[in-house]
Every structure is written in structure tokens, then in C-alpha cells.
């Protein structure tokens, strides 16, 4: 068992429990807790997101073998947004409104998260977002479980600027034309300015 899987096993049940206790959508009379899984199983993001779906199914199965959670069995409801950003919003609405999930684990890219955010806020759903993100967003309907630039990119730059990191003086900020790199590079550029680095 790798370290990441071990950490996920230790934290998924408490995270789900905390999320469910905070969520107004939990049906106290139901015998099951429905968990939405909103990860691409086809398209360009399937190579990354299928692993997350498989991990969630494994963790749900293991938790059910231990008697479930809060005295209830966990039931996975899996949908495939097919790496299609508008379809993410449609599938999120389906999970919350039609399938009546209590909590959802999903999305990978920032654009998929931004696509579903209005749906989760409108329907008062709860989303656990599993990867690093660019920050500059906060919602009571989302648990952002990954690092933001101030927790990841800025410490890396500080290290590279230090003597131990090589005392870097010149910087080139690269990235694809996409939400995460654009926003992270904007944050890093401002940070570098505070350290006296010129454009």
C-alpha cells in the first residue's frame, strides 16, 4: 500500500462524516449515505480521474466492511462527465437533484470545478475537490483538499531563492493557457516583485 492510499484510507471516513454533519441534505431516515463520484471515465482526463474513481470505490467498500459510517451503508453513485466541462455541471446537477447524493467527490481541473460550483451553491450540495488549486476561490459548499500556491509554489520559489536551493536570481514563469498556471503565475509574479525581482 502506498503512502497516498494509506492517507486517503485514514482521512476519507472522517472527511465524509464531517461533510455530512455539516450538510443540510443528509436524510436521517435513509439506511444509506449516497456518495457522488464526479470524475471523468472517458476523454482526455480519464487517465488521471479514473484512478480517483477507483480509489473512492475501494475506500467505500472498505468502510462498508467496517459497518459503514454513522450506522449507515455507503452507496457510490458514479457518473462520467467525459472530460467535458459543461457536462460536469450537468452531471453535478444530476447527482444532487436526481440521485439525491449527500456528498460528492470529484473534478480534477480548475475549469471543471468552476463549472460545477454554481450548481453546488444553488442546490446546497457538498463537493470534496481532491487536487491542488490556484486559490482565490472560497465556497461553503466545497472542501478544497489540495494545496494552494501559498502552500506549494511560493515555498518552492523561496527554497530556490535560498542558498540551499541555489540562490536563483532570474525567473521565467511558464505554463499552459489555462486557469491554474495563469493564476499561479500571476501570484508568483507578485511574490517575486516583493523580493525585488523585476519583470
Stretch-by-stretch model annotation:
Residues 2-15:
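Bacterial N-terminal signal peptides that target proteins for export
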Residues 12-24:
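Bacterial N-terminal signal peptides
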Residues 25-29:
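Sec/Tat signal peptide C-region and signal peptidase I cleavage site
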Residues 30, 54-76, 166, 194-198:
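Signal peptide-proximal N-terminal region
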Residues 32-40, 74-78, 169-172:
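Short, well-ordered beta-strand elements
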Residues 36-55, 79-86, 108-111, 176-182:
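Extracytoplasmic "Venus flytrap"
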Residues 73-98, 152-155:
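Structural motif
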Residues 86, 101-199:
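Extracytoplasmic ligand/sensor domains, especially the bilobed periplasmic-binding protein
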